[in-house]
Amino acid sequence: MKGVFSLNYKPKALNKGDTVGVIAPASPPDPKKLDTALLFLEELGLQVKLGKALKNQHGYLAGQDDERLADLHEMFRDDEVKAVLCACGGFGTGRIAAGIDFSLIRKHPKIFWGYSDITFLHTAIHQNTGLVTFHGPMLSTDIGLDDVHPLTKASYKQLFQETEFTYTEELSPLTELVPGKAEGELVGGNLSLLTSTLGTPFEIDTRGKLLFIEDIDEEPYQIDRMLNQLKMGGKLTDAAGILVCDFHNCVPVKREKSLSLEQVLEDYIISAGRPALRGFKIGHCSPSIAVPIGAKAAMNTAEKTAVIEAGVSEGALKT
């Protein structure tokens, strides 16, 4: 695996009046939903700078690869911009990962936020720079919805405060799949994207870490195939613990005879033998709770809790 950093550092927390950059490194955002979300950022007291390719369209991509990559680089290069927020996911981040200037990001570390297809960028950036990034609800995808959950919006408060976060059953019911306690760096994201990193220079490193997974609109046999690939790659047993998050609409459609999602998850997660909890509202769900990738975390299946340290620093950058 290329450039896996052992020393992590947190970006600086935001203050009211700060400028944030909005980009679309994958697919183009819905214009109306994006406009609604930009108003939300203004309500938080933030100034907004839009990427040049944000509203471009090239098939299912938000512009050509070099345009989307240039937006990513420009937002990190611009010292006025204190955070880089992804408008939406979709498809396309894997196409630009090989061109990322990681030295630029190390020189200009700042908040990076998104999920779904953005998982590929989280893995690439974190493992090649050590920067803690945020797997969180996106602007067009989530914040721009008419019925956005208050807790989804509240996730953005993590960017302003250096506060430890404890996930309990007050947020959602949690099921113990494998008993035990575990602690380590929090890594993971969208299962489809994590699987797509295998065999690339950006292959997910789960050794001694807490792995969280989520997905949407994948049938049980597809989840089976991806978990089997992670299993054969040693990614499940390498992990210290596993957090199974939301798998929205992952039900049989094409196949009359099918295993259930629950059966597939239990086959792989239980056999991995690592402490595991299921039911976290992280991913393509409502509410959608943000978590910092690369932050230290601890899980306790008996207490049904996951404690995650702050993903930002209110002072100088912390390691």
UniProtKB/Swiss-Prot annotation:
GO MF terms held by the record: carboxypeptidase activity; serine-type peptidase activity
Expression induction or repression: Repressed by AbrB, a transcription factor that negatively controls biofilm formation.
Location in or out of the cell: Cytoplasm
Classification via InterPro entries: Carboxypeptidase_A_C_sf, Class_I_gatase-like, LdcA_N, Peptidase_S66_N, Peptidase_S66C, S66_fam
Matching CDD domains: Peptidase_S66
GO biological process, one term: proteolysis
GO cellular component: cytosol
Active site feature: 116 (nucleophile), 214 (charge relay system), 284 (charge relay system)
EC number of this enzyme: 3.4.16.-
Pathway the protein contributes to: Cell wall degradation; peptidoglycan degradation
Disulfide bonds: none
Keywords: Carboxypeptidase, Cell wall biogenesis/degradation, Cytoplasm, Hydrolase, Protease, Serine protease
Chief place where the protein resides: cytoplasm
Record carries keyword Hydrolase: yes
Task performed by this protein: May be involved in the degradation of peptidoglycan by catalyzing the cleavage of the terminal D-alanine residue from cytoplasmic murein peptides.
Family: Belongs to the peptidase S66 family.
Name of protein: Probable murein peptide carboxypeptidase
The gene coding this protein: ykfA
